[in-house]
Amino acid sequence: LTKLFVGSEGTLGVVTEVTLRLVPLPEPANVAVAFFPTIEAATGAVVAVSSRLRPSIVEFMDRVSINAVEDLTRMGLDRDAEALLLVGCDARGEAAAEELALIEQAFVEHGATEHFVADDAETAESFLTARRLALPAMEALGAVLIEDVGVPLPRLGDLIHGIGAIGQRHGIVVGTVAHAGDGNTHPNVIYDATDPAQVERAQLVFGEIMDLAIELGGTITGEHGVGTMKNAWLEAQLGPEAHALGLRIKSALDPDGILNPGIGL
């Protein structure tokens, strides 16, 4: 029942005690860095790497997020690249060399314009920090609606390309970053919150991105949950039978509807 209660976002009960299993802190990973001329090239490399290895990190940044971070850090990121990949390898010794060679081979096969291994901790951390700075960097450009859609890995390129097309169609900037190794993306819908027309278009973009994720066989939430903003898409995500079953479970465990009312149903 653990997954049922955790996934219910507080609508079935309140967690009062949690037992954690701790694992040793890993040593810093080697990080392979690559810039790509197209989204398709970058996501093709993600699929290739993930089919050969189990990297510790596979992070993606699109052109909007690259440029936002470069505006903030001036660290020399390639402003003309359509995508940046960071692939982490926590193997050591000979195994690390073999894995990194396979990662770089995938980069080359998929047309990376620049690639290298940040094998010292300081350089690796600078690129990981750049990825972590993507959200605050984009928040400097305007108000942000953060999405959390995911798809099966082979559809990742279709999703990211489609996200960009949706933004362009509505005249709204969308910067996408992703935990690309599992197909989980965070499109950031950037808009002027003082402009009612932009607010309306941003909401349309938000909804169409979720429609696209569902159409591609994915999910409206890879990490952040349904909450209140995504309720309207929940039945389309689950299908009518699974949605009805969820409502029956809710009714059985919370007949008075007092647990986190209005969330995720």
Tell me the role of every PLM-derived stretch.
Residues L1-L265:
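Noncatalytic alpha-helical scaffold of FAD-dependent oxidoreductases
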